């Protein structure tokens, strides 16, 4: 055999069965934080390494090192010394091992830039090896990002099997995934148990750690070697590690004892790089001859219940992504004006905690969920403070709507009403369309790219507003068919048509009957197996990770829906409905109610859906149906790319995939001469079912799993504070339906505009022009100050895969342009003559530019 590399590395979660920085108190026991467990691992490894020079260990993520050094700054030189002696390496998994299906491509890139800059600062270099261990899927643009970051190997991909030597992304970029043969291991899956003496509080018996150290030593598996896997002409690996257990010095003796039989030593994943140099040399030249290529451009699907479990983990992340993006644009404007820009590192670390794979997936105990929500709450104050430094506040009561996107648009904004009072929002091109004392619906017309609009908030006369609203409402109550535990059904009621300049929507007492597109001149949605915007209750027996049983009984809720009222004004109409889910469909739990409406606004070519849901259910999933009149290809937006909904065979296991797709911004289906598209804002779970009547798109907005899976491991410990996985309580959702003549890049822009609402800021943004797309299909996904303070970063992606030229405007302040990689390393100069720059994109290509000011 060539060599046996022994790697030691624990997998470190930030949240899951524990909190990151908080202890959990439950039933009289204390469960220590992951932070403390990670410290125990590093301290133990340092202790062994200082005594045994042949010992080597890895740390999985930058956040673990950063957090450790924050708490123990005196250990920085110790870690550096071990690194220089080749006893320590830190894998490049990003700052956190994030999800890659439900977060924006810019969040994914930022996570790696944050990691790489931190590791370079501490250790002077960054690993060329990536790990995606335990991430629930890998999307289509990752190979391109990894290649641009200079990564040479992916050492671990979990749950979905990767086949072959190479994974080729949707743009054609590829990364090596070949790994040495697994020949043995040591470690253990069991978790640290609270000390029985002190119940986790910390005492002399447990060395004040709060865990049962004696049991921990017994749980560690001894080294096991599989001789039949050690081949004469190959490099093999022995992998040691756990999630919580810490290694013992005896491991070194066990490895040394094998040296008489094998060429074996402790090492790192990077030690395999010389053995795949030939593969990487071919990839550098775009040569795939003789290489085995993974059959898909993504490594999905698994754990598909994560797309909807604990839905606020998805919604809060999307909101925060948008807010941080707006902040970066404000900072870019400030930089152009003053040459100064804030450091966003701490904000990035804070918000990307919510992008960690178990965070956004919703696969955690209740206390960890609370920690994530609290982190978002505390981040709001930090963002407000930075925003105040980037804007100029006036003495008046004026506020500003700010458009953080590079497109001109009509934008609908929903603003909360203070103290339940009706409010009026006014300003040039600003209209208050309606206010119910909870939410004011506002239309901001023709706001420029990166532009702002002044507005004022005044309190409306509640009495007169209520009287006007009552006069405009006409309630249609159907006929009650039955009641009691089986619920109240409604039937009948007049038909009525409401609409805007684009759509005519026929409604009745039970919901929406049909939708007619006035531009395409055809009915694009109609009642069939399901009604447009109908809520559907589906049996879903599973865990937060996935549905576990192949039983999907769907119950239409149309008959349990009644029309509450219709409001029509000049240029605006909406219909309000109430759907009450019967107790018999909710585990005899009452108060499962959906209050929802559809709104149509002149100047907004979408049918807007919003809902408030009171949810108290068990083993159920709530979906919204969108029937189309054709059975063409389904496709959806992944981070940074529009991709087809690849057919896959559902499978049912603890990490299974049961038919859904992660639609980051939109899902669509090609119908009868048109494309029906559904936009979302943090509800990515999308499925499509086809029949002779046409395709029905379903967007899942809630689920209530009751199987805790690995949240409950009696062989480790029992801590049952995970009932929140059923997502009990109040929720709010927004969706939109829009139809197109054909698939185009316009869908990408419209979906982004729907999900990314206007920001509300207290001061004026700096008066500085930023680049926009003048012509072409690529879209600008990021504008921000360069990390080195020497320019503005502009990233463009051909998300729709058109592969054509795109022209951007060049503001007068631009004196030079550099093409860079995603890490902002300059590659070459680009021309600056004239007022525009034209770039040629291959399909799905990512390009990063640095625009520099004059001296």
Task: Outline where the language-model segments fall.
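N-terminal catalytic cores of secreted or lumenal carbohydrate-active enzymes
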Residues: 1-106, 110, 119-121, 148
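Conserved short loop/turn motifs at secondary-structure junctions
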Residues: 62-66, 97-99, 127-137, 240-245, ...
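CE4/NodB-like, metal-dependent polysaccharide N-deacetylase domain
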Residues: 108-141, 148, 219-239
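Catalytic domains of cell-wall/extracellular-matrix polysaccharide-remodeling enzymes
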Residues: 123-163, 247-254
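C-terminal (or distal) subdomains of carbohydrate-active enzymes
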Residues: 142-145, 179, 191-199, 203-204, ...
């Amino acid at each position: 055999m060539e060599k046996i590399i022994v790697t030691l590395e624990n997998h470190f979660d930030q949240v899951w069965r524990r909190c990151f920085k908080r202890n959990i108190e439950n039933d009289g026991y204390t469960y220590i934080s992951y932070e403390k467990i990670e410290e125990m691992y590093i301290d133990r490894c340092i202790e062994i390494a200082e005594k045994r020079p042949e010992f080597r260990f890895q740390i999985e993520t930058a956040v673990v090192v950063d957090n450790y050094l924050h708490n123990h700054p005196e250990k920085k030189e110790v870690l550096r010394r071990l690194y220089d002696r080749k006893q320590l390496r830190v894998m490049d998994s990003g700052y956190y091992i994030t999800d890659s299906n439900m977060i924006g491509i810019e969040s994914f890139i930022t996570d790696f830039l944050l990691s790489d800059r931190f590791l370079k600062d501490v250790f002077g270099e960054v690993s060329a090896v990536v790990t995606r261990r335990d991430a629930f899927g890998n999307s289509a643009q990752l190979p391109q990002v990894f290649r641009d970051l200079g990564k040479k190997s992916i050492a671990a991909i979990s749950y979905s099997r990767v086949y072959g030597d190479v994974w080729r992304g949707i743009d054609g970029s590829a990364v090596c995934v070949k790994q040495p043969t697994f020949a043995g291991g040591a470690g253990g899956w069991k978790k640290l148990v609270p000390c029985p003496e002190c119940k986790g509080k910390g005492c002399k018996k447990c060395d004040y750690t709060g865990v049962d150290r004696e049991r921990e030593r017994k749980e560690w598996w001894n080294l096991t070697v599989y001789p039949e896997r050690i081949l004469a002409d190959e490099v093999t690996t022995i992998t040691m590690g756990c999630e919580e257990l810490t290694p013992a010095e005896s491991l070194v003796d066990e490895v040394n004892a094998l040296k008489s039989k094998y060429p074996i030593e402790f090492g790192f994943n990077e030690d395999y790089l010389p053995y795949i140099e030939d593969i990487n040399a071919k990839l550098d030249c775009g040569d795939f001859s003789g290489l085995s290529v993974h059959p898909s451009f993504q490594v999905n699907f698994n754990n598909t219940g994560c797309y909807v479990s604990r839905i606020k983990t998805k919604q809060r992340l999307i909101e925060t992504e948008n807010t941080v993006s707006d902040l970066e644009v404000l900072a870019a404007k400030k930089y152009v004006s003053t040459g100064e820009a804030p450091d966003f590192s701490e904000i990035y670390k804070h918000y990307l905690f919510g992008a960690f794979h178990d965070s956004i997936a919703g696969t955690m105990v209740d206390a960890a969920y609370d920690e994530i929500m609290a982190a978002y709450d505390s981040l709001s104050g930090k963002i407000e403070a930075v925003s105040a430094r980037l804007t100029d506040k006036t003495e008046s009561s004026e506020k500003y709507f700010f458009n953080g996107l590079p497109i001109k648009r009509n934008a609908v904004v929903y603003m909360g009403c203070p103290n339940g009072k009706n409010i009026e929002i006014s300003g040039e091109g600003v209209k208050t369309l309606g206010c119910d004392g909870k939410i004011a619906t506002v239309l901001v017309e023709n706001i420029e790219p990166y532009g702002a609009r002044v507005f004022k908030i005044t309190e409306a006369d509640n009495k007169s507003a209520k009287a006007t609203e009552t006069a405009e409402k006409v309630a249609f109550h159907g006929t009650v068919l039955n009641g009691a535990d089986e619920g109240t059904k409604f039937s009948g009621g007049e038909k009525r048509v409401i609409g805007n300049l684009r759509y005519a929507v026929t409604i009745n007492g039970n919901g929406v009957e049909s939708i007619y597109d006035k531009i395409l001149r055809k009915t694009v949605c109609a009642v069939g197996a399901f009604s447009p915007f109908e809520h559907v209750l589906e049996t879903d027996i599973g865990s937060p990770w996935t549905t576990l049983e192949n039983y999907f009984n769907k119950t239409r809720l149309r008959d349990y829906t009644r029309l509450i009222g219709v409001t029509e004004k000049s240029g605006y109409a909406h219909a309000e409905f109430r759907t009450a889910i019967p107790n018999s469909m909710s585990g005899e739990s009452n108060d499962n109610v959906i209050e929802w409406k559809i709104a149509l606004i002149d100047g907004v070519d979408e049918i807007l859906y919003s809902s408030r849901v009171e949810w108290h259910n068990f083993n159920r999933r709530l979906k919204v149906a969108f029937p189309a009149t054709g059975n063409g290809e389904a496709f959806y937006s992944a981070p940074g790319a529009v991709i087809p909904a690849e057919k896959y065979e559902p499978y049912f296991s603890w990490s299974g995939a049961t038919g859904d797709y992660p639609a980051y911004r939109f899902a669509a289906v090609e119908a009868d001469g048109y494309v029906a598209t559904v936009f979302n804002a943090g509800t990515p779970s999308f499925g499509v079912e086809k029949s002779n009547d046409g395709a029905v798109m379903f967007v899942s907005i809630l689920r209530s799993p009751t199987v805790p899976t690995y949240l409950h491991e009696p062989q480790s410990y029992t801590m049952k504070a995970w009932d929140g996985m059923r997502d009990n309580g109040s929720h709010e959702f927004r969706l939109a339906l829009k139809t197109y003549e054909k698939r185009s890049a316009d869908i990408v822009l419209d979906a982004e505009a729907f999900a990314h609402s206007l920001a509300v800021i207290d001061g004026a943004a700096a008066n500085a022009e930023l680049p926009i797309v003048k012509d072409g299909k690529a879209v600008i996904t990021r504008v921000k100050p360069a990390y080195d303070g020497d320019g503005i970063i502009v990233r463009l992606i051909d998300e729709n895969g058109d592969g054509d030229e795109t022209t951007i405007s060049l503001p007068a302040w631009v004196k030079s342009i550099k093409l860079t990689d995603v890490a902002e390393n300059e590659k070459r100069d680009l021309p600056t003559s004239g007022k525009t720059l034209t770039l040629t994109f291959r399909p799905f290509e990512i390009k990063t530019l640095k625009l520099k000011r004059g001296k």
